[in-house]
Amino acid sequence: MSEPPQIKVSISLHQDTLYELETAIEHAAKSNYNSITIPLAHRRFEREFVQEPLKTGHNRFTRSDLLLSSTQWLNRVICRLSCGVDCDSEDDNVRKQGESTLRQELSYAEHLVQNGYILLRLKSGNCANLARVTTVGLKGVLLVEVPMVNPKVAQANWRSDADYECGADDTWNWWNNFRSYADFDTHVKVALEFTADIPEKREIYRWLGEPVDAVVLSSNIFLTNANNYAVLSKAHQELLVLFYRTFGCHFIVKANPDDKRLVHYADYIKYILRSNYKKDPMQGYDDLLEIPLQPLYDNLDSFTYEVFEKDPVKYILYQNAIEEALRDRVPSSEIQTRTSIIMVVGGGRGPLVRAALNAASKSKRMVKIYVVEKNPNAIVTLSALINELWKDKNIELISTDMREFEPPEKADILVSELLGSFGDNELSPECLDGAQKHLKPDGVSIPCKSTSYLNPCMAPKIYSQIRSMEKSLHAKDRIVTSRYMEGTYVAYLKNAYHIDNPQAVFEFVHPNLDPIIDNSRYKTLRFKAQLDCVMHGFCGYFDSVLYKDITISIHPFTHTKGLASWFSMFFPLTEPVQVRAGEEIVVNFWRCVASHKVWYEWNITAPRQSHIHNVQGRAQPIWK
């Protein structure tokens, strides 16, 4: 039996009170905890900020920083701010006392842990002043502790005399209010407390779209098994694994320091995570922004070619499609006398040529292959392959743009891989429309159809990255162009919540037999939110029919297993939109075409109106 993988799991022991700081750290370490989470001041210590001499005396409200080294403060301690204050009280004295207390503690916490973790417990959605006080000039990471289920909701489920309306306040709304007041500050993250009650699956998925940095586990949600060990219910185990896979988060365990099962809690969490660990093949690309390629305008480099060629699935499917087409076009009685003409438009470094040769070999059909490639650097590679590996094959290499190629004969099969994350965003319609004149009247194109899809999503991590790029622009340029907030991006969206299911947007068929070809498009889509959420933009996908029933897809419901060449497209909104459960989301989407470029435009008309993004391709045109 193989050993479980040694993944890194960081666990902090939460303590309400302690006397000897270094002893507490050593005690936690012996119980397999990496750090401790402690209050900066005793919860019953009410400080005086106005009256002397108490005001001066209360400046010494907590322990000295000399008790630990700066490295220990940073790596072994999470500072917790007082939770017994009310910065949003209607009573001015209470409010001002809360403000002064938290400002004092926050200043000292940042003095201790520099850019480390500071924990703040959120008790309600009435938190505008709390957010203002605690997030201005924040240098470290503020972990906002939020319970997954409102305790009053759980209470209402069991007590007939409980006021359900009071308990119906969703804790996600608490968090959403706080981070909205903080203007989506990237220093503010969630410490999500797992409660005994677990919410509906869709509410869990909504939390997966938030910046969860820590999971808080109280000792009272652990059960005791037959061997007297602390364990979690099956549902909590699955939740634990799900959040770790999505975020790689760390954990905070709330327990009495004298609890004899302290070591069991830590060991059990690590055991569950290691036992259920599955390495994500796309690890490292999580929520990483990439600018979409423009292979028609730019020449790809060797590294980019190599990444695409490593896709374990795509070229097998292309090979199967070409093989099927060859079998259909050349009956068994003609395999010795008939040669099929295959044109590979956009040969790259030869993966499609290799797929065509393999298809010919497996189907036992004779082929002549024209390879058309405009990139002079890729021509060097293709020439070497033809002269060294394929010298006995009937292959002709043409160094030109596929739209300008004038072949001596027409093709039976036209093969290309010009698909982008949104299907047509690498200008496959324009390229194939120009190349389809080389097809025989009964010739086939592989692929023969592509469809793009769109759905609204909540993706604060991606949105924050884009906004940080936008803020780096000079104010004048930012007003004129909104260059980054109106551009499109490719990303492996892991930390995101999909508000509704994707719907089809544009469809392109090849060869295009329309008497007048027009590749501009316009579509209005209507979606509906199931939960309160924040919309940051739209995710784009595509699927494509290569030949007959052989397809490739990055649509979430039909994603081709193992396909790694494409991530989702992301179309941002310049401002986040608060959406309520049951509200309709209406988006207008355009594909615009000019003589020298193509671009997308989009806007929403519900639940509120937005301006039209990327007008005239001002932020991101796709050059022909």
Could you say what each language-model-derived stretch is?
Residues M1-K314, N320, D328-I341, V345, ...:
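Class I SAM-binding transferase module
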Residues E324:
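Pre-Walker A adenine-sensing motif
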Residues G348-R349:
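Conserved SAM/SAH-binding loop
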